[in-house]
Regions:
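Mature N-terminal segment immediately following signal peptide/propeptide cleavage
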Residues: 31-64
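Enzymes and membrane/adaptor proteins characterized by extended Gly/Ser/Thr/Asp/Glu-rich
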Residues: 61-69, 73-166
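Short, structurally constrained coil/turn elements
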Residues: 14, 51, 104-105
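Alpha-helical transmembrane segments and their juxtamembrane interfaces
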Residues: 12-14, 55, 124
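N-terminal targeting or signal-anchor segments and their processing/structural boundaries
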Residues: 19-35
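Bacterial Sec-dependent N-terminal signal peptides
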Residues: 1-24
Length: 166
């Protein structure tokens, strides 16, 4: 009996947990290879200055003035930044500036925001979500999931890839 229990315990405690931690395949192998090839070819074509610039995300005001557009141009074309973090403003101006910045970039920019309460934390006339302390008190996981999904949908519509929200 002991001889049968040890292999079963080994499987339960060592093999099954390893299998449970496997990441799901989000992309097909062909897609992954194509993406890696593109990334490698772009990276190999970059200068040291461009590679260093990709490490930086710089804050920009949501203001469509000529002075602000010149600042964005300088960040993108001269400093070769990897992304921008837009501060307060309105939806239309941010969309305009995002499109402007992306049009200048040799490599697509990572557009970010600091919006713990959703877009309303930085952009006027958008949906304001509850603060995180309130969310912590909610005992309905499906509601929290729906909250996160909606916040992600709104960010995606604005071209925001990263929301620095805990």
């Amino acid at each position: 009996m002991k001889n049968r229990i040890l292999p079963i315990l080994f499987i339960l405690f060592f093999i099954l947990p390893v299998q449970a931690k496997r990441e799901p395949d989000l992309y097909k192998k062909a897609d992954s290879q194509r993406m890696e090839h593109w990334v490698d070819s772009v990276f190999d074509s970059m200068s040291v200055k461009e590679r260093i610039g990709q490490l930086f995300v710089l804050a920009v005001d949501v203001n469509t003035s000529a002075k602000n557009k010149e600042l964005i141009r300088k960040y993108v074309e001269e400093y070769k930044v990897g992304g921008l973090l837009f501060t307060s403003g309105d939806v239309q101006k941010q969309a305009e500036l995002t499109n402007y910045a992306q049009s200048l970039a040799k490599i697509p920019l990572m557009i970010t925001m600091d919006g713990e309460w959703g877009l309303a934390m930085r952009l006027k006339n958008t949906t304001k979500f509850p603060i995180n302390m309130t969310l912590g008190a909610i005992r309905n996981d499906s509601l929290i999931y729906a909250y996160g999904k909606e916040m992600g949908r709104q960010c995606r519509r604005m071209g925001i890839q990263v929301n620095f929200a805990p």
